[in-house]
Amino acid sequence: MKLSNIPQRYVIVFLTFLSTCVCYIERVGFSIAYTVAADAAGINQSSKGTILSTFFVGYACSQVPGGWAAQKIGGRKVLLLSFVLWSSTCFLVPLDPNRVGLLVVARLLVGVAQGFIFPSIHTVLAQWVPPHERSRLVSITTSGMYLGAALGMWLLPALVELRGPESVFLAEALAGVIWSLLWIRYATDPPRSEHPKAAAAGFGGALLPTNVNHHKVTHIPWKKIMLSLPVWAIVVNNFTFHYALYVLMNWLPTYFELGLQISLQGMDSSKMVPYLNMFVFSIVGGFIADYLITKRILSVTRTRKFLNTVGFLIASAALMVLPMFRTENGVILCSSVALGFLALGRAGFAVNHMDIAPRYAGIVMGVSNTAGTLAGIIGVDLTGKLLEASKLVYSDLSHPESWRVVFFIPGLLCIFSSVVFLLFSTGERIFD
């Protein structure tokens, strides 16, 4: 089948799916490559935590500006610029754990560049995706994150073993360039004739205007957005989701290496299972949400609350029992359940900003993702400090108690966040 025969909105969804996939290959890849290089150089866990968390400082700084830029310039252009910037940085900067200053600057630049990605994607999707396909198409796009993480965990340790840690940077830069060329070739802004007739089919309002400079969208209701309890319900859950995700993504390699004394290079494809599980559960969650809504089984509000609550509470239980398991299979099982149900919960909070503010989807996503990025800064850096403190008590990190508080913190946050979402979220449009 020719690409021209496929509805353009599905082409856009596929390309944005690939973009999130490539981004998370980069994030997992840096964690794997840097862990190997830093351990070989004798870098301590606290310093590792600082370097790993530096990305999130830049990422946090560019979330809201990314939403603003996508709103004013257009998500398609901003997304391309982001890919060009982070790919160039990966290509040009050498991986040397002893050159701390250079690594800090490089990770800040990559973080700033990637911070524009998700606000841009959601601005593009808000223009292309009709309400009755919203949950599943947005979930398909974001599921690329987890497939990327799974592929990174599967392929990149072998690449490190064969070619060294530096080769990971070059592979990631190449992937970014290839995606950019595909985006230039196939991505377009939606003409009115391309819009699916969602409203006529009885599934809600029309899509956004295609002209981002239209006079009706020049005024952004910042005060109303920042004082909205439903927005804060999304923000709190985004913080918790990313705290759990980034702690596992950045420290699970160390947990296997030092906590269980298992080499990542020696593990089989099981190390990709937690992220592959996220990929599957994310898509399943989107289809369940759309089914419940379009079949009128539950309202949009109840659907979002139901999936968010189920996902976060089961993930909480899995996170808190994870350090009790001392085998490779046990840890793979617990981390798979935790990450899988967190991904299911994204059919609640992570699509909700398009329910309540479709016109300002990129802006609300930027605000929400800022909180998620702060979670990365806090969680990744705090974990390094907690592990250094544990070494003073237990002498090394192979003792299970060294890791208990690391996984209890995101577990408790999941419970708190699910309660906040139950109390304050809504599926109704509250911003014109």
UniProtKB/Swiss-Prot annotation:
Keywords carried by this UniProt record: Golgi apparatus, Membrane, Signal, Transmembrane, Transmembrane helix
GO molecular function, one term: phosphate transmembrane transporter activity
Signal peptide: 1-23
GO cellular component: Golgi apparatus; Golgi membrane
Expressed in which tissues: Ubiquitous.
Segments traversing the membrane: 50-70, 78-98, 101-121, 140-160, 164-184, 229-249, 273-293, 305-325, 331-351, 360-380, 405-425
Superkingdom, natural source: Eukaryota
A Pfam family recorded for this sequence: MFS_1
Chief localization: Golgi
The keyword Membrane is annotated on this UniProt entry: yes
GO BP annotations listed: response to nematode
Membrane topology: Multi-pass membrane protein
Keyword Ligase on entry: no
Entry's localization field: Golgi apparatus membrane
Job description of the protein: Inorganic phosphate and probable anion transporter.
Family per record: Belongs to the major facilitator superfamily. Sodium/anion cotransporter (TC 2.A.1.14) family.
Name of the protein this chain belongs to: Probable anion transporter 5
Gene label: ANTR5
